[in-house]
Amino acid sequence: MFQTFISRHNSNFFSDKLVASSVTPASLAPVLQTPKATSSTLYFDSLTVNAGNGGFLHCIQMDTSVNAANQVVSVGADIAFDADPKFFACLVRFESSSVPTTLPTAYDVYPLNGRHDGGYYTVKDCVTIDVLPRTPGNNVYVGFMVWSNFTATKCRGLVSLNQVIKVIICLQPLK
């Protein structure tokens, strides 16, 4: 099934500014921020990315009270690095019984259709995610993750995640 990017985000008009000033990529990727919301926009102006092989991510907690096992998550991101790292960006789905600070060892990866141009990366995409926990009592989280063999660099940009809960029906005029 082909999905197009859902451009109407229900996120706040203002974005959250990242509090952390630096991050060290790791195999258990550190979580930059996890709001208890189904929609979040994170802005980071001058994030120092320390040298390391691994990643970091921004995630949201999924609303599991909806009457569907699968929900669409849309992502819009525009990030830039001062250096020109070759990196992989994706959505990840994982479960945790508490607010995560790092990516757990068990997670699902969803590739994104983004554009990498030099030190810039832009993506507008959406993915259908299983929102029901596989382990009773866990919460489901979805995050935008950047993974690379980083050299020390600065990073700036905006990442917007949105769980699409509303169904929008578009009627076309009769011909």
Swiss-Prot record:
Coiled coil: none annotated. It is found in: Virion. Its main location: virion. It comes from the Viruses. Gene3D superfamilies: 2.60.120.20. The keyword Membrane does not apply. Keywords: Capsid protein, Host-virus interaction, Viral attachment to host cell, Viral genome ejection through host cell envelope, Viral penetration into host cytoplasm, Virion, Virus entry into host cell. One of its GO terms (cellular component) is viral capsid. It holds the Pfam family Phage_G. GO terms for biological process: symbiont entry into host cell; symbiont-mediated perturbation of host process; virion attachment to host cell. InterPro entries: Capsid/spike_ssDNA_virus, Spike_G, Viral_coat. Belongs to the microvirus G protein family. Attaches the circulating virion to the bacterial lipopolysaccharides which serve as receptor for the virus. Determines the phage host-range. Probably triggers with protein H the injection of the phage DNA into the host cytoplasm upon conformational changes induced by the interaction with host lipopolysaccharides. The virion is composed of 60 copies each of the F, G, and J proteins, and 12 copies of the H protein. There are 12 spikes which are each composed of 5 G and one H proteins. This is Major spike protein G. It comes from Enterobacteria phage S13 (Bacteriophage S13).
